[in-house]
């Protein structure tokens, strides 16, 4: 079997939705050695101060850092052992002929072209999906690709001389600087994968960091504590590929019973909520359930899948964009920590009604993304209202805030029961 291709940046964040999918197919134990648990964010201010912000209140509310390459290798090895599945590498699906239901393929090893009959076709060919683009000009999918004016480059902090971590290993490290940020995620070997997110152009953009002097000056000003830990800083910043950040949204994901878009081909999102992989794995869980219910009635299967998941994908796409602003900017505001403290207090008092939006997304696989977004908007307004004139949690009228939660948010079990009734 061919090795899984690396070449892509940004460590993956495995959360409840992804773990749920891996457990359902029985391979979570294979993935476990690759995982590094993270309890929260370590925010590094420009003046050297650090603040640790927990993701959740319970000890089991963790997010796991995992390298893309390691996870890909295990998933491909498992797939390779399935008797009726054949893996073909370096075969590029370059288009789709709807009337004939055939995929046009180019063999990248020799440039030869051939066709494959596909009835139906599950198209999981990425954000730049050629299958999806084959329908451009029609109303079949209505795909729209939107790029951020920001990009990213991968850097690294090696393990220390004794193989030790040079930063706390149980945190996602963020250095927020308003319009840009540097993040670091731990790997099992004691090293960290860093990702530098910057505007593509402008004063503090990749375009202006064009030589060693500009890179060194930039890091000395904005990331003075990180620069000494990155031995290949200039080489990596100047020579590593610049990654793009974008969102794919579609009006539809299927062409009757013929084609179904899956994963990034249907709903690529920016990485700032760590949910792209988790959303794709959730797709698999949902699709498996619907296929079990309807077997090979593909028009019904595809329509049901779209009806249940498309709005959720749009919701997490929005929340991921929101989280970019939070990570690079809002998290620096003392009010952010106060709102988080109030959210935790309300969750303690009313766990059946108030779950922070971040926790709903990351730790509650049974709460749809759309529900998390909708409840999160109500909660955000409530948190803003009760902290607007407060300087600490002691200044907040907690009883009044709890009463407001009861008035504005139905019990979360009511939502769960409604969803179960609709699916049955």
Show where each model-derived region lies.
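Catalytic P-loop NTPase motifs of RecA-like helicase/translocase cores
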Residues: 2, 130-131, 268-270
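Active-site-adjacent segment of FAD-dependent monooxygenases/related oxidoreductases
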Residues: 3, 7-78
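Short, solvent-exposed loop/turn segments at secondary-structure boundaries
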Residues: 6-9, 205-210, 272-276
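Acidic/histidine metal-binding catalytic segments
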Residues: 33-37, 223-238, 295-304, 313-318
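Conserved FAD-binding catalytic core of PHBH/FMO-like flavoproteins
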Residues: 77, 82, 91-95, 100-245, ...
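General small-molecule cofactor/ligand-binding pocket signal
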Residues: 86-88
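Conserved mid-domain beta->alpha element of the FAD-binding
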Residues: 122-123, 155, 241-332, 368, ...
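C-terminal helical "tail/cap" subdomain of flavin- and related membrane-associated enzymes
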Residues: 289-424
């Amino acid at each position: 079997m061919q090795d899984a291709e690396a070449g892509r940046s940004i460590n993956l964040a495995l959360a409840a939705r992804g773990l749920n999918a891996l457990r359902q197919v029985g391979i979570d134990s294979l993935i476990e050695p690759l995982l590094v648990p993270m309890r929260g964010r370590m925010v590094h201010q420009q003046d050297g101060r650090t603040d640790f912000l927990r993701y959740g209140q319970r000890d089991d509310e963790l997010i796991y850092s995992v390298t893309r390459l390691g996870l890909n290798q295990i998933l491909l090895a498992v797939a390779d052992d399935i008797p009726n599945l054949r893996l073909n590498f370096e075969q590029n699906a370059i288009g789709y002929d709807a009337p004939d239901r055939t995929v046009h393929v180019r063999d990248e090893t020799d440039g030869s072209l051939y066709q494959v009959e596909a009835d139906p076709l599950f198209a999981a060919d990425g954000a730049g999906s050629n299958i999806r683009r084959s329908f451009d000009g029609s109303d079949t999918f209505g795909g729209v690709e939107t790029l951020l004016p920001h990009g990213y480059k991968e850097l690294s902090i090696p393990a220390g001389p004794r193989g030790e971590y040079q930063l706390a290993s149980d945190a996602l490290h963020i250095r927020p600087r308003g319009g840009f940020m540097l993040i670091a995620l731990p790997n099992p070997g004691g090293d960290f994968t860093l990702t530098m997110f910057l505007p593509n152009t402008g004063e503090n953009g990749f375009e202006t960091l064009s030589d060693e002097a500009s890179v060194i000056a930039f890091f000395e000003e904005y990331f003075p504590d990180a620069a000494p830990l990155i031995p290949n800083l200039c080489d990596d910043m100047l020579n590593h590929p610049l990654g793009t950040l974008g969102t794919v949204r579609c009006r539809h994901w299927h062409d009757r019973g013929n084609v179904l878009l899956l994963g990034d081909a249907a709903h690529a999102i920016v990485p700032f909520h760590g949910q792209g992989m988790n959303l794709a794995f959730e797709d698999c869980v949902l699709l498996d359930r619907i296929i079990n219910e309807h077997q090979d009635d593909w028009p019904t299967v595809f329509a049901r899948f779209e009806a249940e998941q498309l709005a959720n994908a749009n919701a997490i796409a929005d929340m991921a964009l929101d989280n970019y602003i939070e990570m690079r900017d809002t998290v620096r505001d003392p009010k952010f920590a106060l709102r988080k403290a109030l959210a935790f207090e309300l969750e303690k008092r009313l766990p059946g009604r108030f779950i922070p939006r971040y926790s709903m997304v990351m730790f509650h696989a049974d709460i749809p993304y759309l529900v998390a977004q909708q409840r999160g908007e109500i909660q955000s307004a409530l948190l803003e209202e009760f902290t607007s004139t407060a300087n600490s949690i002691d200044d907040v009228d907690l009883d009044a805030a709890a009463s407001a939660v009861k008035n504005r948010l139905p019990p979360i079990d009511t939502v769960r029961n409604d969803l179960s009734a609709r699916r049955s």
